[in-house]
Every structure is written in C-alpha cells, then in structure tokens.
Amino acid sequence: MTVRAILHIFVEPGKIEDVGEALAKMPEIIDVYELTGEYDIIVTTRTNDLHKLRSLISEKLMRVHDVKVVTTSVVLHTYKLNSKEIFE
C-alpha cells in the first residue's frame, strides 16, 4: 500500500530557504513549496506504509535544523494527479 501525504511545516523565522533546500535533498520528498499563509513550507511525499511515513517525520524532518512543527495530512483519495483525472 502506498501512502501519500502532505506535510505542513512551520520554520524558524528567516530560515525558510535553508529548510526548503534541506528538504529538497531528501529522496522521500516529492515536492517542496514555500508558501504565503498559515504554513511556511508544504511538502508532498509518498511512502510504502504508515510506519515509514512516521519514521520520515520523526527521524528526518523533525531533525532538520530550524523545523519547528510538522502537521501531516494523509491523502485518502486522489481525484486528479499530474493534470490527469483519476476515477476509481
């Protein structure tokens, strides 16, 4: 089972670029976005199971210097991916 997740990340002020670049180097991370609004960075990821997602968050993301908080949203269903509609 593949688990897709969107991770919402709060970063120490002035450190968004450093954190974004560090996250972009992680092979488990698919996309990294710097945002306006509530969160500083959002990343998308795909893991083989929830245990691997948990490990990614606790053992890698939370250890990146200047990451303050990670909030996770697990994708339940995808309606459109890469500009293609998905109907299952």
Regions found by a protein language model. Name each.
Residues 1-88:
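A compositional/biophysical signature of low hydrophobicity enriched in polar/charged and small residues
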